[in-house]
């Protein structure tokens, strides 16, 4: 495998303002460097100090790290704690009346929930689960809308030592069945339906369909939240949320867990092949989530924080359910979508709730640019202090719009690189210390030993692309793949790298300043005439064109070049057809050739009103690869937000 070439040239840099730097918890590069040096000098001591500072222990640990069974690492293994206790109980003495959650429904109703109220709801539901026979080590599948009860269910599982597996509410019955079967779950928690963008989406009916398939015999009970007035089928196996919690005590003694006991399994999305059950620990995971929340967002106790993710994904686990609550934060939880009832919804909510820290996905940013690039200017967004992005690399042009239009040039952009498997942010600017660059996730957080290597495991020189690895195990790292340790080793600690480094599966390069630039997944790397090009860079070039709102690039086999470049493009205006489409396609091909070079010029350009995305906003690139190759689509498309656009994307301009 030859070295991946980096062709994206981005030179803009934005240091923290003096005003921001002065109020920041980690202020200035010297403070950042001091933390990094502390981690380098005494790696175990660095993490042990953080674990003692940020977590409350029932039984303090004496052993920090155990690598004797590498790559099955252990952290704080002889310590005991409870994750729910760390997120709720410990705040009650001084902050019982502090708002934990500001919940806004799809139709705009707002309900504040205090830490005391959240604690009582979690205890009641935990007692309800215990009454169903759920206990330590049992698996519970949660298939819920984005409502506070989803967080209650997760925290209740953590409280009694049950292992939760949240399945995103957009997954099909087949995908749900696969996860129930792999986890051998005992209980499913769901709702009659969810409400998204004014539309009702049945959930209980999907659960019933999944449980009617082979392989779900482990399920004993289904708990159903009545989210709307729509009735749903209720059999002998089913019980309503209200019936389960009625009369349950408002206190529930936490189950004290070993630091290494599993907290949850989260299956990586079905759009990336056979689901892998990513298993996270209790203490190490919580430490990563809480500390990175504090550092990456410069969190202050009076902040109003809003992450727009769904709890069905790792971002919703780490930066809604666990990290913010462990730190005692107040956060907005939103049931709806950014474009309902109109494209001003996010900005209106930021104004109304006086949000200080806003964390969303580049996909949402790009779609909001398309729907109204000037809309944010109609709202008072002066409360914002930090803007974050997550889920995929952000194109420099989208970054600049986010920075200038949403943040008014005041707010650092915290572009966070991390994964389901890492549990918490790995590479991200500490906003009071690190200058940001559009499109770069900047520098590793202190204690994260990230590097870029070639296929032999040797470090590559600046400006050359390679494989992103993390050279030392860290507390929030995935512990194994549920029931598949061999796959865990082969996937993340492959023999080619002597089994030593965590292989992220992303290609990246590092510039002369040490900044990391994610170029895309290793399988999103194109080999065009012997040149390895990251799809991210071609997409960035396309999006830099004033006509283009969004672009996704994939490869398809080519007799001469090895791979041809196929671009799927959404324009800011209406979708072109016929001669107009040919004209715009020719213009965009010339544009890319000018921006990057002829080598990266797309062979085919196809226009759609949108790109095929899962309901969490991820572009389904495997689907695009099938379309590009002219293959029949065999992938599960049940998580697609917009299946009707597939026909448009078959047409070559």
Swiss-Prot record:
Pfam families: ACAS_N (PF16177), AMP-binding (PF00501), AMP-binding_C (PF13193). Keywords: Acetylation, ATP-binding, Ligase, Magnesium, Metal-binding, Nucleotide-binding. GO terms for molecular function: acetate-CoA ligase activity; AMP binding; ATP binding; metal ion binding. The modification N6-acetyllysine is found at residue 618. Its EC number is 6.2.1.1. One of its GO terms (cellular component) is cytosol. Signal peptide: none annotated. It is an enzyme of class 6 (ligase). ATP binds at residues 391-393, 415-420, 506, 521, 532. It catalyses: acetate + ATP + CoA = acetyl-CoA + AMP + diphosphate. Mg(2+) binds at residues 543, 548. Acetylated. Deacetylation by the SIR2-homolog deacetylase activates the enzyme. Catalyzes the conversion of acetate into acetyl-CoA (AcCoA), an essential intermediate at the junction of anabolic and catabolic pathways. AcsA undergoes a two-step reaction. In the first half reaction, AcsA combines acetate with ATP to form acetyl-adenylate (AcAMP) intermediate. In the second half reaction, it can then transfer the acetyl group from AcAMP to the sulfhydryl group of CoA, forming the product AcCoA. Belongs to the ATP-dependent AMP-binding enzyme family. HAMAP family: Ac_CoA_synth (MF_01123). This is Acetyl-coenzyme A synthetase. It comes from Laribacter hongkongensis (strain HLHK9).
């Amino acid at each position: 495998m030859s070295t991946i070439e980096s062709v994206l040239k981005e030179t803009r840099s934005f240091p923290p303002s003096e005003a921001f730097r002065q109020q920041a918890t980690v202020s200035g590069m010297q403070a950042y460097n001091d933390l990094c040096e502390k981690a380098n000098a005494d790696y175990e001591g660095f993490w042990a100090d953080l674990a003692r500072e940020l977590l409350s222990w029932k039984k303090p640990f004496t052993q920090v790290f155990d690598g004797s069974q590498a790559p099955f690492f252990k952290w704080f293994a002889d310590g005991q704690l409870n994750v729910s206790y760390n997120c709720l109980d410990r705040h009650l003495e001084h902050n019982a009346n502090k708002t934990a959650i500001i919940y806004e429904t799809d139709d705009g109703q707002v309900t504040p929930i205090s830490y005391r109220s959240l604690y009582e709801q979690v205890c009641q539901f935990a007692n309800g689960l215990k009454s169903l026979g759920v206990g330590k080590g049992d698996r519970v599948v949660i298939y819920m809308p984005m409502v506070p009860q989803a967080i209650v269910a997760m925290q209740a599982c953590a409280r009694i030592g049950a292992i939760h597996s949240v399945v995103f509410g957009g997954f099909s019955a087949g995908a749900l069945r696969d996860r129930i079967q792999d986890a051998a779950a005992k209980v499913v928690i769901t709702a009659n339906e969810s409400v998204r963008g004014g539309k009702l989406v049945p959930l209980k009916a999907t659960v019933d369909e999944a449980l009617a398939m082979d392989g779900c015999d482990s399920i004993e009970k289904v708990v159903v939240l009545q989210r709307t007035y729509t009735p749903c089928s209720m059999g002998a196996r089913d019980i309503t949320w209200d019936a389960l919690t009625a009369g349950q005590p408002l206190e529930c003694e936490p189950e004290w867990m070993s630091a290494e006991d599993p907290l949850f399994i989260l299956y990586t999305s079905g759009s990336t092949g056979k689901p892998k059950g990513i298993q996270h620990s209790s203490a190490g995971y919580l430490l990563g989530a809480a500390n990175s929340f504090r550092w990456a967002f410069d969190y202050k106790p009076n902040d109003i924080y809003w992450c727009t993710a769904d709890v069905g994904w790792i971002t919703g686990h780490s930066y809604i359910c666990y990290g913010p609550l462990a730190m005692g934060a107040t956060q907005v939880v939103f049931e709806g979508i950014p474009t309902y009832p109109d494209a001003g919804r996010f900005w209106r909510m930021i104004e109304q709730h006086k949000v200080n820290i806003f964390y969303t996905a580049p996909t949402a940013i790009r779609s909001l640019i398309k729907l109204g690039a000037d809309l944010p200017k109609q709202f008072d967004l002066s409360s914002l202090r930090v803007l974050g992005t997550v889920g995929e690399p952000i194109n420099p042009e989208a970054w600049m719009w986010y920075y200038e239009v949403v943040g008014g040039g005041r707010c650092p952009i915290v572009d966070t690189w991390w994964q389901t498997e890492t549990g918490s942010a790995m590479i991200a600017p500490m906003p009071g210390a690190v200058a940001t660059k559009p499109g770069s996730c900047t520098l590793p957080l202190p204690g994260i030993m990230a590097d870029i290597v070639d296929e032999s495991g040797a470090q590559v020189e600046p400006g050359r692309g390679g494989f992103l690895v993390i050279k030392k195990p860290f507390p929030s790292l995935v512990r194994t793949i549920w029931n598949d340790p061999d796959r865990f080793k082969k996937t993340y600690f492959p023999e080619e790298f002597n089994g030593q480094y965590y292989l992220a599966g992303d290609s990246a390069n590092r510039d002369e300043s040490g900044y990391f630039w994610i170029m895309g997944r290793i399988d999103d790397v194109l080999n065009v005439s012997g040149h390895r090009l990251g799809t991210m860079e071609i997409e960035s070039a396309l999006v830099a064109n004033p006509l283009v709102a969004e672009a996704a690039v994939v490869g398809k086999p080519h007799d001469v070049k090895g791979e041809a470049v196929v671009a799927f493009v959404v324009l800011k205006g209406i979708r072109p057809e016929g001669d107009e489409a040919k004209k715009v396609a020719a213009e965009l091909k010339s544009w890319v050739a000018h921006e990057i070079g002829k080598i990266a010029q797309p062979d085919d350009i196809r226009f759609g009103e949108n790109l095929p995305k899962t309901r969490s906003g991820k572009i389904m690139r495997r689907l695009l690869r099938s379309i590009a190759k002219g293959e029949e689509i065999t992938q599960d498309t049940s998580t697609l937000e917009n299946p009707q656009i597939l026909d448009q994307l078959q047409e070559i301009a």
